[in-house]
Amino acid sequence: MIKITFPDGSVREYNEGVTGLQIAESISSRLAQDVLACGVNGETIDLSRPINEDANFVLYKWEDEQGKHAFWHTSAHLLAEALQELYPGIQFGIGPAIENGFYYDVDPGEAIIKEADLPAIEAKMAELAAKKEILVRQSIAKEDALKKFGERGETYKCELISELEDGHITTYTQGAFTDLCRGPHLTSTAPIKAIKLLTVAGAYWRGQEDRKQMTRIYGITFPKKKMLDEYLVMLEEAKKRDHRKIGKEMDLFMFTDMVGKGLPMWLPKGTALRIRLQDFLRRIQARYDYQEVMCPPIGNKNLYITSGHYAKYGKDSFQPIHTPEEGEEYFLKPMNCPHHCMIYKNSPRSYKDLPLRIAEFGTVCRYEQSGELHGLTRVRSFTQDDAHLFCRPDQVKEEFLRVMDIINIVFKSMNFENVEAQISLRDKVNREKYIGSDENWEKAEQAIIEACEEKGLTAKVEYGEAAFYGPKLDFMVKDAIGRRWQLGTIQVDYNLPERFQLEYMGSDNQKHRPVMIHRAPFGSMERFVAVLIEHTAGKFPLWLTPDQVAILPISEKFNEYAEQVKAELRKFDVRAIVDDRNEKIGRKIRDNEMKRIPYMLIVGEKEAENGEVAVRKQGEGDKGTMKIEEFGKNLAEEVSNMINKW
């Protein structure tokens, strides 16, 4: 008999070789119908896999990310099976589950797969899913796998297999389709009830631009048609909120191939928005005793060799810059932490000096594949609101609490009200890959858990998800249309202090390693602005919006009065513009509404005679007339009340 420990701490005994599905059935037949995958000692596996030893065990349903992942991974195989029937001779690349759905990269040979072909492929997928095909996992020798896929002319699969370590590899078969795959998968295609293929795109094989361009088909599936219908409604709303569209309408940022792909340029209004965000965070950080630094945009190759980033991320960096005089190599800065380690090392440190909190709005550059670039959310140059905290092991919890305060202020000020968190801890069993002492890990893990409890933050604990150098806490927010975005991370790091030989003198007069904590409430300025645009549909909080007021003279003869109104409002720190175009007032109102300006002040003969303005509020329409001073005071008070909340 083996002992199975459930998340609530309860333990049950089962026969060796029991499967996850059998365990679910032993609890309830209804549960067995709903589960999609299971977790065994931190590893997500198929429900049909036998369990042969004592294990920590969890069942995953649709509501769990692991459940969705297995569902969409199987859906990718279902797509491939349909393509195999419809396009004989098609070759397959990779087909993973992604955050929202799945894709498969294929080489259809002479055939061309267009978006007009997607409905027919969907229909074939539905036909196959209805057969409730069982997925069969098989472990075979590497040479047998090469032979099997080679006989089918699967050159892409053979390339992947040849790079695997010698030994046994796994395949999954459903119906007539067999794929090279680690899993996990559903037990059958039966749960897949609603299917939608979304787009067709090009993607270079393995992301390398000198390789074959394949056809990438994106899709999403659900266990119920109602879920798909709701998702498609959300997609339509997401198109309206696309930050690329709204950013152009509001004149916030631009891209041009002349400057380079993935290199955003911030226009005056977008720059004003960024500056306000940075000043906002600077004020908060000052309250929490952060010291701001500035580092160069490049670094010597040896810096990144020491940090380990060169070995791990060298391929994601731009080509090195060679200095002919010194014969050295420099890289565009891909991250800020190595520079901050050198700042820490610049002076001797005592335990009394800690914690040391170093912050920087540091611009970094990473070579993202052109096919992965997307507006502001995936770029090649971006600015991180980075901070690195150097502290003693006994200070980790307090530092987490302080950073959580800052992140909470950021989210509340931007009207992100639905916040989730995930604590990523070590694998419960396999701990060889982690750097740092068990004692320090246990202290840090417990500190994160206790910090979440003290703040009343509901956090999901994921074992085995920690980086090799430390546990972390990730924050996910739901936007106005229900999408989840990962914003804000607090990461413990035992690796860089070791690599850079960072030290402080302890109260025992002995040298000790500090604990390093990475944190970024925004993540990056670019991605945060993109998420904020899509969350608010461009209707930013009044204190943040680039232009708070548009003054609209009804004809040219009132332009001078409009300028006087602007000058008066400036006394109240109101950011106003004058729309003095020779256009009808209706056109001006529509255009400024599209620019999401919160207030419009219409001025004509009556307003000029009485020193007044006719007020319109975004989304609410006419608010009547006011004296200029009264409006200025009211607006200043509205902004002040917002800012004083945090």
From Swiss-Prot:
Residues 242-541 are annotated as: Catalytic. Its main location: cytoplasm. It is found in: Cytoplasm. InterPro entries: aa-tRNA-synt_IIb, aa-tRNA-synth_II, aa-tRNA-synth_II/BPL/LPL, Anticodon-bd, Anticodon-bd_dom_sf, Beta-grasp_dom_sf, TGS, TGS-like. PROSITE patterns: AA_TRNA_LIGASE_II (PS50862), TGS (PS51880). GO terms for cellular component: cytoplasm. This is Threonine--tRNA ligase. The gene is thrS.
